[in-house]
A protein has these predicted regions:
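Positively charged n-region of N-terminal signal peptides that target proteins for export
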Residues: 1-6
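Short alpha-beta junction capping motif
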Residues: 31, 83-122
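Aromatic-Pro/Gly-enriched surface loop or interdomain linker
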Residues: 20-83, 87-90, 180, 188-189, ...
């Protein structure tokens, strides 16, 4: 299961463990934003991933890129990225070939982080069943390592934006014991990574969002 992850992502993992620098070509960690069909705004908040990478560069010993990559599921480059991120407010649609390819990516060592930006929850849950029809999204307990991989969140994912007044929720799908999808709902974590003038979040709220984002990336690269 982990062979592809070992061979394709080894530069990133070595970077995370021994602190490679820009002198090591090809070792930089870059998050790929997933461009999906269905009409949802997959491109939402273009500053979020570059800002998260900047934060991580200051607080980890990882060698990091400065910008996001944009990848579609059927792109050959999909398997070059250890972590794929998706967000949006609207509908997602996966064709059968896309669902099969995303399953292959995830079961070969890849990791998907999805953050509902208020409006994609129902669609996301429907489409994920195409990828893993026999798996259910399971709520992640606060004790899970993803909440403690670099910073500690004793009560799970932080609440960044209020919508319907519910508590922040975190879910996962596991394949052969490994979390392959991490999904946050009613949290808006990635909104907290946006430029300060976009949502006018207080500094302490943005800090928590960046810290949780760092946890997600560190966990994805080390599990």
């Amino acid at each position: 299961m982990k062979n592809i992850k070992i061979f394709l992502f080894i530069g990133v993992l070595m970077s995370a463990s021994v602190g490679w620098t820009q002198e090591n070509p090809g070792s930089e960690f870059v998050v790929a934003r997933l461009k999906y069909s269905g009409g949802g705004d997959w491109y939402n908040d273009p500053s979020i991933l570059p800002n998260l990478l900047d934060f991580m560069a200051e607080r980890t010993n990882m060698s990091l890129g400065k910008s996001e990559a944009i990848v579609e599921i059927m792109d050959e480059d999909l398997f070059l990225y250890p972590v794929v991120f998706m967000t949006g407010h609207g509908r997602i649609h996966l064709s059968r070939p896309e669902a099969a390819r995303l399953r292959l990516y995830l079961t070969s060592g890849g990791f998907l982080y999805a953050d509902d930006d208020y409006g994609m929850d129902a669609s996301f849950r429907t489409e994920i069943k195409k990828i893993f029809p026999d798996h259910e999204l399971k709520e992640i307990p606060f004790s899970h390592p993803i909440f403690h991989s670099h910073f500690s969140f004793a009560k799970g994912a932080p609440k960044i934006h209020e919508h319907d007044g519910g508590p922040p929720k975190s879910y996962g799908i596991f394949h052969e014991g490994r979390m392959v999808i991490f999904y946050t709902f009613d949290t808006n974590i990635s909104d907290g990574w946006a430029d300060p003038n976009i949502h006018n979040d207080p500094p302490e709220v943005r800090q928590k969002a960046f810290e949780m984002g760092t946890n997600i990336m560190v966990y994805a690269l080390t599990n």
